Amino acid sequence: MRLRKQELGDRNLVGARVDAARKKKGMKQKELLAQLQVNGVDMNASGLSKLEGQIRFVTDVELVALADILEVSVDYLLGRAPQ
């Protein structure tokens, strides 16, 4: 059975935090995708949109790259620490 946003959203803190951190830096999704590519993470626009929309889970490699690019801690993205 496929999870819907409201079902997945309670278990996916990372997406909302990535979205907030990206916007705080004034970065567009396209810019974040380009930086992910530079860091060896292959994600397309749909994947990032689904991640930020809390529809898609993040991998460990993506999590570390996102934290580095957005200049936040992995703990912040996981909801375990304030920014």
Residue positions per predicted region:
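DNA major-groove recognition helix of helix-turn-helix/homeodomain DNA-binding modules
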Residues: 59-76
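Helix-turn-helix DNA-binding elements, focusing on the entry/boundary residues of the two helices
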Residues: 18, 29, 45, 60-63
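Conserved hydrophobic/aromatic packing and binding residues within compact polymer-binding modules
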Residues: 18, 32-33, 48-51, 77
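Short basic helix-loop element that most often maps to the first helix and adjoining turn
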Residues: 16-38
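Short, basic amphipathic alpha-helical segments that act as recognition/interaction helices
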Residues: 82-83
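Recognition helix of helix-turn-helix/homeodomain-like DNA-binding domains
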Residues: 37-58
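A detector for short, charged/polar N-terminal pre-domain segments
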Residues: 1-13
